[in-house]
Protein backbone atom coordinates (compact mmCIF):
# COMPACT_ATOMS: atom_id res chain seq x y z
CA UNK A 1 0.00 0.00 0.00
CA UNK A 2 1.32 3.41 -0.95
CA UNK A 3 0.11 6.88 -0.15
CA UNK A 4 1.09 9.98 -2.05
CA UNK A 5 0.16 13.64 -1.95
CA UNK A 6 1.76 16.74 -3.39
CA UNK A 7 4.41 16.97 -0.66
CA UNK A 8 4.54 13.52 1.00
CA UNK A 9 5.13 10.02 -0.38
CA UNK A 10 4.78 7.03 1.97
CA UNK A 11 5.52 3.52 0.77
CA UNK A 12 4.70 0.61 3.09
CA UNK A 13 6.79 -2.57 2.84
CA UNK A 14 5.38 -6.02 3.51
CA UNK A 15 8.35 -7.75 5.12
CA UNK A 16 8.41 -11.47 5.81
CA UNK A 17 4.65 -12.02 6.08
CA UNK A 18 4.25 -13.32 2.57
CA UNK A 19 2.27 -16.29 1.29
CA UNK A 20 5.44 -18.04 0.18
CA UNK A 21 6.98 -17.84 3.65
CA UNK A 22 3.81 -19.22 5.27
CA UNK A 23 3.72 -22.03 2.70
CA UNK A 24 7.36 -23.06 3.19
CA UNK A 25 7.16 -22.80 6.98
CA UNK A 26 4.14 -25.16 7.00
CA UNK A 27 5.67 -27.61 4.51
CA UNK A 28 8.96 -27.66 6.39
CA UNK A 29 7.25 -28.13 9.76
CA UNK A 30 5.05 -31.01 8.56
CA UNK A 31 7.89 -32.68 6.65
CA UNK A 32 10.27 -32.48 9.59
CA UNK A 33 7.59 -33.91 11.90
CA UNK A 34 7.26 -36.83 9.48
CA UNK A 35 11.01 -37.44 9.46
CA UNK A 36 11.20 -37.19 13.25
CA UNK A 37 8.27 -39.57 13.76
CA UNK A 38 9.82 -42.16 11.42
CA UNK A 39 13.12 -41.88 13.31
CA UNK A 40 11.36 -42.25 16.66
CA UNK A 41 9.30 -45.18 15.34
CA UNK A 42 12.44 -46.98 14.18
CA UNK A 43 14.01 -46.43 17.61
CA UNK A 44 10.94 -47.70 19.49
CA UNK A 45 10.21 -50.50 17.02
CA UNK A 46 6.53 -49.45 16.86
CA UNK A 47 4.50 -47.51 14.33
CA UNK A 48 3.74 -44.09 15.78
CA UNK A 49 1.87 -43.07 12.63
CA UNK A 50 0.01 -45.87 10.87
CA UNK A 51 0.43 -44.20 7.46
CA UNK A 52 4.24 -44.44 7.62
CA UNK A 53 5.32 -48.06 8.17
CA UNK A 54 8.73 -47.78 9.80
CA UNK A 55 9.32 -51.34 11.05
CA UNK A 56 11.57 -52.09 8.07
CA UNK A 57 13.79 -49.09 8.85
CA UNK A 58 16.71 -49.88 11.13
CA UNK A 59 17.47 -47.28 13.77
CA UNK A 60 21.16 -47.24 12.92
CA UNK A 61 21.94 -45.63 10.41
CA UNK A 62 18.60 -44.80 8.69
CA UNK A 63 16.62 -43.90 11.83
CA UNK A 64 19.41 -41.69 13.14
CA UNK A 65 19.61 -39.82 9.83
CA UNK A 66 15.81 -39.42 9.66
CA UNK A 67 15.78 -38.08 13.24
CA UNK A 68 18.59 -35.66 12.41
CA UNK A 69 16.72 -34.38 9.34
CA UNK A 70 13.57 -34.00 11.43
CA UNK A 71 15.33 -32.00 14.14
CA UNK A 72 17.16 -29.83 11.59
CA UNK A 73 13.88 -29.18 9.77
CA UNK A 74 12.19 -28.16 13.02
CA UNK A 75 14.97 -25.65 13.70
CA UNK A 76 14.69 -24.13 10.22
CA UNK A 77 10.90 -24.10 10.47
CA UNK A 78 11.12 -22.37 13.86
CA UNK A 79 13.37 -19.72 12.32
CA UNK A 80 10.85 -19.11 9.52
CA UNK A 81 7.94 -18.90 11.96
CA UNK A 82 9.87 -16.42 14.13
CA UNK A 83 10.64 -14.16 11.16
CA UNK A 84 6.95 -14.28 10.24
CA UNK A 85 5.86 -13.56 13.83
CA UNK A 86 8.29 -10.64 14.20
CA UNK A 87 7.56 -9.45 10.63
CA UNK A 88 11.24 -8.89 9.89
CA UNK A 89 11.88 -6.53 6.99
CA UNK A 90 8.57 -4.69 7.14
CA UNK A 91 8.45 -0.95 7.51
CA UNK A 92 8.03 2.16 5.42
CA UNK A 93 9.83 4.73 3.31
CA UNK A 94 8.60 8.31 3.82
CA UNK A 95 9.66 11.15 1.57
CA UNK A 96 8.50 14.58 2.81
CA UNK A 97 9.22 17.43 0.39
CA UNK A 98 7.65 20.05 2.65
CA UNK A 99 10.00 19.30 5.57
CA UNK A 100 12.87 18.19 3.31
CA UNK A 101 13.29 14.88 5.17
CA UNK A 102 13.51 11.23 4.08
CA UNK A 103 12.71 8.59 6.73
CA UNK A 104 13.38 4.89 6.23
CA UNK A 105 12.09 2.48 8.89
CA UNK A 106 12.44 -1.31 9.04
CA UNK A 107 11.69 -3.95 11.68
CA UNK A 108 14.58 -6.32 12.41
CA UNK A 109 15.17 -9.26 14.72
CA UNK A 110 14.55 -8.73 18.47
CA UNK A 111 17.39 -7.14 20.35
CA UNK A 112 18.99 -3.77 20.81
CA UNK A 113 18.67 -2.80 17.14
CA UNK A 114 15.19 -4.19 16.45
CA UNK A 115 14.02 -0.89 15.01
CA UNK A 116 16.13 0.42 12.13
CA UNK A 117 15.34 4.09 11.56
CA UNK A 118 17.32 6.19 9.09
CA UNK A 119 16.65 9.87 8.52
CA UNK A 120 18.25 12.06 5.85
CA UNK A 121 17.83 15.52 4.42
CA UNK A 122 16.50 15.56 0.88
CA UNK A 123 19.29 17.83 -0.26
CA UNK A 124 21.79 15.03 0.60
CA UNK A 125 20.22 12.65 -1.94
CA UNK A 126 22.48 12.56 -4.99
CA UNK A 127 20.59 10.17 -7.24
CA UNK A 128 18.27 7.20 -7.62
CA UNK A 129 20.12 4.13 -8.89
CA UNK A 130 18.77 1.13 -10.74
CA UNK A 131 20.85 -2.03 -10.67
CA UNK A 132 19.87 -4.54 -13.34
CA UNK A 133 21.36 -8.03 -13.58
CA UNK A 134 19.93 -10.26 -16.27
CA UNK A 135 20.51 -13.94 -16.75
CA UNK A 136 19.38 -17.08 -14.95
CA UNK A 137 18.61 -15.18 -11.72
CA UNK A 138 17.65 -11.65 -12.80
CA UNK A 139 17.72 -8.86 -10.21
CA UNK A 140 16.38 -5.37 -10.45
CA UNK A 141 17.06 -3.28 -7.36
CA UNK A 142 16.30 0.37 -6.69
CA UNK A 143 18.84 2.30 -4.59
CA UNK A 144 19.03 5.81 -3.20
CA UNK A 145 22.51 7.34 -3.16
CA UNK A 146 23.11 9.61 -0.16
CA UNK A 147 26.02 12.05 0.04
CA UNK A 148 28.49 10.75 2.65
CA UNK A 149 26.40 7.63 3.42
CA UNK A 150 26.67 5.50 0.28
CA UNK A 151 23.72 3.71 -1.29
CA UNK A 152 20.61 2.44 0.48
CA UNK A 153 18.39 -0.23 -1.13
CA UNK A 154 14.75 0.77 -1.46
CA UNK A 155 13.45 -2.51 -2.89
CA UNK A 156 14.10 -5.94 -1.44
CA UNK A 157 16.68 -8.06 -3.20
CA UNK A 158 14.34 -11.07 -3.33
CA UNK A 159 11.55 -9.24 -5.16
CA UNK A 160 11.76 -10.73 -8.64
CA UNK A 161 8.34 -9.57 -9.81
CA UNK A 162 9.60 -6.21 -11.04
CA UNK A 163 9.73 -6.10 -14.81
CA UNK A 164 12.20 -3.66 -16.37
CA UNK A 165 9.29 -1.36 -17.19
CA UNK A 166 7.97 -1.40 -13.59
CA UNK A 167 11.36 -0.66 -12.02
CA UNK A 168 11.99 2.15 -14.53
CA UNK A 169 8.54 3.60 -13.84
CA UNK A 170 9.06 3.49 -10.08
CA UNK A 171 12.54 5.03 -10.37
CA UNK A 172 11.27 7.78 -12.68
CA UNK A 173 8.38 8.66 -10.35
CA UNK A 174 10.64 8.72 -7.30
CA UNK A 175 13.36 10.73 -9.05
CA UNK A 176 10.75 13.23 -10.27
CA UNK A 177 9.28 13.52 -6.77
CA UNK A 178 12.71 13.99 -5.17
CA UNK A 179 14.04 16.08 -8.09
CA UNK A 180 17.22 14.02 -8.49
CA UNK A 181 18.78 12.23 -11.50
CA UNK A 182 18.55 8.50 -12.27
CA UNK A 183 21.63 6.30 -12.73
CA UNK A 184 21.52 2.80 -14.23
CA UNK A 185 24.13 0.13 -13.42
From Swiss-Prot:
Q: Where in the cell is it found?
A: Plastid, Chloroplast thylakoid membrane
One term under GO cellular component? photosystem I
Q: Where are the transmembrane segments?
A: 20-40, 57-77
Q: Pfam families given for it?
A: Ycf4
InterPro entries (alphabetical): PSI_Ycf4_assembly (IPR003359)
* Coiled coil regions, renumbered to chain: none
Question: What processes in GO biological process is this protein linked to?
Answer: photosynthesis
Query: What are the alphabetically sorted keywords of the record?
Result: Chloroplast, Membrane, Photosynthesis, Plastid, Thylakoid, Transmembrane, Transmembrane helix
Asked if Aminoacyl-tRNA synthetase is a keyword of the record, the answer is no
Q: How does it sit in the membrane?
A: Multi-pass membrane protein
Q: What does this protein do?
A: Seems to be required for the assembly of the photosystem I complex.
PANTHER family per the UniProt record, alphabetical: PHOTOSYSTEM I ASSEMBLY PROTEIN YCF4, PTHR33288
Q: Which family does it belong to?
A: Belongs to the Ycf4 family.
What name is this protein filed under?
Photosystem I assembly protein Ycf4
The protein's organism comes out as Agrostis stolonifera
This protein's encoding gene: ycf4
Amino acid sequence: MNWRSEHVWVELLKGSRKRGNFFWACILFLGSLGFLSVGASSYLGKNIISILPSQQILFFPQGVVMSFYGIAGLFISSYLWCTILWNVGSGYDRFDRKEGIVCIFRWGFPGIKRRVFLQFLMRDIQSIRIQVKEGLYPRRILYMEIRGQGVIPLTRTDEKFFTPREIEQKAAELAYFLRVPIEVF
